[in-house]
């Protein structure tokens, strides 16, 4: 039986009042909209018309909304029962673009369906892989998911689009004001203001961006071209194609997305249980199955692949509102907004400093949560090496990606994502260090983790020197 954390205002099964539900849903929808620029870029790159752009964006929103709703379900092993919203998956963008270049939108749709079906298979076998994911490695997954948000959040905060571009002072000022409002409302605002911290920050940020010209003519031009109400264009929606040469790449991206979703769901578990010790793989399996349905549905209806949103999960932690009913509200609202292009357009053109401020704000919670999970069961010398080596090589991939430019063949996919690399290194090192040499009967000394579990798991782990004597 889980124990409710003290700082939680609305727990996973609480049902907020309708006005609260609506405002919390709007907060999550605004964050879910942050990646709607991806289908715009994809369709434009292959020479698609404005109608096609609008149609793919709308269908992507519908797919994400459906995914958010089914994730909040918990029916006979399907769904996680958590507030874990979906957005247009950045993980899938590169390979979806490749598919669109090679075979247009029909090929992108067909390969997206393949990725969704593969994740369904992965969801069914994850329970058999429990031995590979002890708490310290699941914490690492959460930490690396958060780390993946850092480059995007900081670049948006500083107003940098290209590597050599100078920092924009105006952008930083607006972002700093936006995040300051969020922090003040969260730390000193009390329960009610904390619920709406991000919404208050967004309103402040949009206003300042408008005054300073960061929300300018090009944004209004895009909004002016969009109708108020329109059915999504379904031209060619039933056309699907398939290419064997793209299967390996889509499967790798599918696994990476599943690992990210696993980290998000673990974060959901921890936020909702003060006595959390280890992931519930039955629940995670149900969540991954729901995620696979979201990806498959997105491909079937003609949108881009969706993925669970780390920033939305962190938002629920920051506001203290993790009710799955907020997931129903946000998902339904996102589906409805797919039929109102002008309103969804306002959300999809979020000013750079506002997006940066939100990402910096919510990522802070996820980074700390990942560290807490890693340390919660105590650290010994084996865990230190497994986690330390994984983080070192993962960060090297992000900081100096050219180090691995010469790697090709079947190893190459492992070096496409720091999350994937960190997970593989941690799992392999952990299993190697746990292996016993043949003929040596050795019972390891009781670890700090075991002792703490016997005391009820109330202490948060810290590095203990006695562990190094093993």
Question: What are these model-predicted stretches?
Answer:
Residues 1-81, 439, 453-469:
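N-terminal alpha-helical transmembrane segments of multi-pass membrane transport
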Residues 1-23, 217-234, 270-286, 432-470:
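Intrinsically disordered, low-complexity non-transmembrane regions of multi-pass membrane transporters
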Residues 99-218, 330-444:
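Membrane-embedded alpha-helical modules
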Residues 54-55, 77-91, 131-140, 194-199, ...:
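Short, non-helical or kinked segments that cap or interrupt transmembrane helices
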Residues 1-11, 15, 181-184, 198-251, ...:
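Hydrophobic transmembrane alpha-helices of multi-pass solute/ion transporters
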Residues 51-60, 69-128, 136:
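Membrane helical hairpin/interfacial module
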Residues 9-10, 16-19, 43-79, 249-324:
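Membrane-embedded helical hairpins/re-entrant loop segments and their flanking transmembrane helices
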Residues 19-35, 167-179, 196, 212, ...:
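Hydrophobic, membrane-embedded alpha-helices of multi-pass small-molecule transporters
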């Amino acid at each position: 039986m889980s124990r409710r954390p003290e700082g939680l205002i609305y727990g996973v099964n609480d049902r907020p009042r309708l006005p609260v539900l609506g405002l919390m849903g709007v907060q999550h929808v605004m964050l879910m909209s942050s990646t709607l620029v991806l289908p715009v870029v994809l369709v434009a790159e292959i020479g698609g018309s404005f109608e096609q752009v609008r149609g793919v964006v709308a269908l992507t929103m519908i797919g994400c909304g459906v995914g958010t709703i089914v994730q909040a379900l918990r029916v006979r092993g399907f769904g996680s029962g958590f507030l874990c919203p979906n957005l247009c998956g950045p993980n899938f963008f590169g390979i979806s673009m490749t598919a669109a270049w090679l075979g247009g939108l029909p090929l992108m749709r067909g390969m997206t369906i393949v990725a969704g079906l593969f994740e369904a298979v992965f969801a069914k076998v994850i329970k058999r892989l429990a031995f590979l994911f002890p708490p310290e490695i699941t914490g690492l997954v959460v930490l690396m998911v958060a780390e993946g948000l850092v480059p995007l959040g900081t670049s948006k905060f500083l107003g940098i689009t290209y590597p050599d571009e100078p920092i924009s002072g105006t952008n930083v000022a607006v972002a700093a004001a936006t995040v300051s409002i969020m922090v003040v409302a969260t730390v000193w605002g009390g329960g009610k203001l904390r619920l709406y911290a991000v919404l208050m920050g967004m309103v402040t940020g949009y206003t300042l961006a408008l005054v300073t010209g960061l929300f300018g003519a090009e944004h209004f031009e895009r909004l002016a071209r969009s109708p108020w109400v329109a059915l999504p264009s379904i031209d060619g929606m039933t056309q699907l194609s398939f290419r064997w040469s793209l299967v390996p790449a889509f499967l790798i991206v599918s696994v990476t997305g599943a690992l990210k979703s696993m980290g998000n769901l673990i974060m959901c578990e921890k936020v909702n249980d003060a006595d959390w010790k280890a992931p519930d793989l039955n629940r995670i399996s149900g969540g991954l199955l729901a995620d696979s349905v979201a990806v498959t549905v997105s491909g079937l209806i003609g949108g881009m692949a969706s993925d669970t949103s780390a920033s939305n999960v962190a938002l629920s932690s920051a506001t203290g509102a993790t009710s799955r009913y907020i997931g129903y509200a946000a998902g339904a609202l996102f589906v409805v907004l797919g039929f109102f292009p002008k309103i969804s357009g306002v959300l999809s053109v979020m000013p750079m400093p506002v997006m940066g401020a939100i990402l910096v704000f919510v990522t802070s919670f996820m980074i700390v949560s990942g560290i807490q999970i890693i340390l919660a069961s105590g650290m010994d010398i084996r865990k230190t090496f497994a986690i330390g080596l994984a983080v070192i090589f993962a960060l090297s991939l992000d900081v100096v990606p050219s180090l691995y430019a010469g790697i090709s063949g079947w190893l190459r996919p492992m070096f496409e994502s720091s999350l994937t690399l960190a997970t593989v290194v941690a799992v392999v090192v952990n299993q190697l260090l746990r292996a016993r040499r043949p003929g040596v009967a050795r019972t390891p000394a009781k670890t700090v983790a075991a002792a703490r579990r016997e005391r009820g798991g109330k202490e948060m782990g810290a590095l203990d020197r006695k562990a190094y004597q093993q």
